[in-house]
């Protein structure tokens, strides 16, 4: 939105409400400002409230932080949201009879108009079936596959599978996922020996498995030195290398996911997709799903153990994709 070749900044004054303003000191785009909102101490600049109240258009993704609670008449509020997947709303946030704080919200397609209009207690015509801005990075990465792999790991010319497990353990209080016990942080993996054996198999198949750490997941206990073809990636590394997560997704040859919205997003690429469902029953009990039968909405291989992961990798190398 701040790219000058698009030209929005010539028509509008653009205000970005950011938690770390210092990161944008080198941004010198005309008619664009950065204002502190919800920094690490929870503080927001008075300017954030001013612009939040007086802006003609107010966009947010996770929550508005109340910055536009006193908005002026005529302001249009758009909830960009952060993805529609298979998870049900967290306990305590279901069927609340509250008025939504937006005029419009984005969803990937018609099936999610029904689920989100029920969750947010809003009219279906408020939900715009436009997908999410992050799709642009996935469909049109600014770097080539080899450039991204070389920047992150010094690799080139490898087949890449990205594994993006949702969180099971986090520091967030009241999360139903915290009650889910797994033998390993990675669902479908029983212990480190299985992971080492998988690493050996990946080496034979000449596939790199990149495991993206969920930012809410705690208790990661990996030792990359023990592997040749498995690597872990966190937000900090991507930020350091100036690579967007959805660019990394966009250059991958296949994806392992589970109940997250990234699996829905990945359908746009029409590439091999595997759903890791080792804890499906307990997840359904603790968190629940938005669909009565979520398996009907999962057009990819169903994976329950490490043998299924190997099958997925084998299918990737020989070009088998039943979906």
For every predicted segment, state its role.
Residues 56-81, 240-287:
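A donor-sugar binding/catalytic signature common to diverse glycosyltransferases
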Residues 224-229, 234, 259-323:
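Catalytic binding pocket for nucleotide-activated donors in carbohydrate/polymer assembly enzymes
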Residues 1-6, 13, 134-226, 303, ...:
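Conserved catalytic-core segment of nucleotide-activated headgroup transferases in glycan assembly
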Residues 20-24, 63-66, 83-86, 110-113, ...:
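Short, solvent-exposed loop/turn segments at secondary-structure junctions
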Residues 39-55, 215-264:
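Donor nucleotide-activated moiety binding/catalytic core segment of transferases
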Residues 1-142:
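Active-site and donor-binding regions of nucleotide-sugar-utilizing enzymes
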Residues 16, 77-81, 120-124, 163-170, ...:
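Tryptophan-centric aromatic hotspots in well-structured domains and transmembrane helices
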Residues 11-14, 100-105, 208-209, 251-254, ...:
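Short active-site oxyanion
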């Amino acid at each position: 939105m701040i790219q000058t070749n698009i030209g929005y900044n010539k028509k509008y004054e653009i205000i970005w409400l950011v938690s770390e303003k210092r990161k944008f000191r080198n941004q010198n785009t005309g008619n664009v400002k950065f204002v502190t909102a919800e920094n690490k101490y929870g503080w927001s600049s008075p300017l954030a409230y001013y612009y939040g109240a007086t802006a003609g258009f107010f966009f947010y993704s996770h929550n508005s932080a109340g910055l536009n609670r006193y908005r002026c008449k005529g302001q249009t509020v758009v909830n960009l949201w952060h993805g529609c997947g298979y998870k049900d709303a967290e306990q305590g946030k279901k069927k609340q009879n509250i008025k939504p704080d937006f005029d419009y919200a984005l969803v990937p397609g018609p099936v999610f108009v029904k689920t989100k209009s029920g969750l947010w207690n809003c009219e279906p015509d408020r939900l715009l079936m436009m997908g999410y801005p992050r799709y642009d990075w996935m469909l049109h990465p600014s770097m080539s596959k080899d450039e991204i792999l070389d920047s992150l790991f010094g690799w080139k010319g490898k087949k890449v599978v990205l594994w993006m497990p949702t969180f099971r353990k986090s520091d967030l209080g009241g999360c139903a996922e915290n009650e889910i016990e797994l033998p390993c942080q990675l669902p479908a993996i029983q212990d480190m020996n299985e992971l080492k054996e998988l690493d050996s198999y990946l080496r034979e198949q000449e596939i790199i498995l990149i495991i993206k750490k969920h930012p809410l997941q705690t208790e990661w206990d990996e030792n990359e030195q023990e592997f040749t073809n498995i690597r872990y990636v966190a937000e900090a590394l991507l930020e350091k290398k100036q690579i967007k997560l959805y660019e990394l997704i966009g250059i991958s040859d296949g994806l392992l996911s589970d109940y997250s919205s990234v699996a829905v997003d990945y359908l746009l690429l029409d590439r091999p997709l595997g759903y890791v469902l080792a804890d499906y029953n307990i997840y359904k009990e603790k968190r629940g799903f938005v669909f009565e039968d979520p398996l009907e909405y999962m057009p990819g291989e169903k994976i329950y153990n490490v043998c299924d992961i190997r099958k997925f990798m084998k299918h990737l190398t020989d070009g088998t994709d039943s979906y």
